[in-house]
Amino acid sequence: MNNPASTAQNLSAGNKQKKAYSLAAFRVLIVEDFPFMADLMSSMLREFGIGHIVQASCGNEGKEMITMFNGDAGSHNKIDVVLLDWLMPNGDGLDLLKWMRGNSKDSIRFMPAILCSAYASEQVVTVGRDHGANEVLVKPVSAQQLASRLLYVIDKPRPYLKAPGFFGPDRRRRDEPYKGEERRVSTEEDIKQYHERL
């Protein structure tokens, strides 16, 4: 098994040249309702060298933590990245993403978010991205996957788009060109039907 610490320090996030990352000053918020999963992700992040890890057990608590750390424009203790679970009581990951992307404070609205889900399908990725997730991971998350996606949002952030009813990172879809076309394919009805099937 690869050492997660060396994985995070040596991953290039898609580049051919290796980079070294100093993540000691980074602050990551984990929003996860299962304590075991939250602790597992915390220990992986510590192995990567992340200096500050904050946990919340539901979307509503996540909002409180984000507001506390990122609500003040002059704060030096901002959360840099949010890892959030999709399905949780008291505010799920999609609700939290919608709140973040609709927030009036840029320090919250542009915060990178990695959505985690136990369901592996293209539709999960599409719905997650439609709600503003920068990246989507399938649980159980490996150290390699987490390090790769974390460094990707740090090193190669997606440009943000504003469209009617949507603000968030560009999904970089391969099958639809820019040219002003609607790039999002999930409607509220699609999301409702998806939740009914779970």
Residue ranges and their predicted role:
Residues 55-81:
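Acidic, metal-coordinating helix/loop segments flanking the phosphotransfer/catalytic sites
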Residues 42, 95, 109, 120-135, ...:
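Alpha4 helix (beta4-alpha4-beta5 surface) of REC/receiver domains from two-component response regulators
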Residues 35-60:
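Two-component/phosphorelay signaling modules centered on CheY-like receiver
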Residues 89-90, 121:
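The feature encodes the CheY-like receiver
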Residues 92-109:
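Short amphipathic alpha-helix used as the core "switch/output" element in two-component signaling
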Residues 7-15, 155-198:
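CheY-like receiver
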Residues 141-154, 162:
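C-terminal output helix
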Residues 80-87, 117:
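Active-site residues of response regulator receiver
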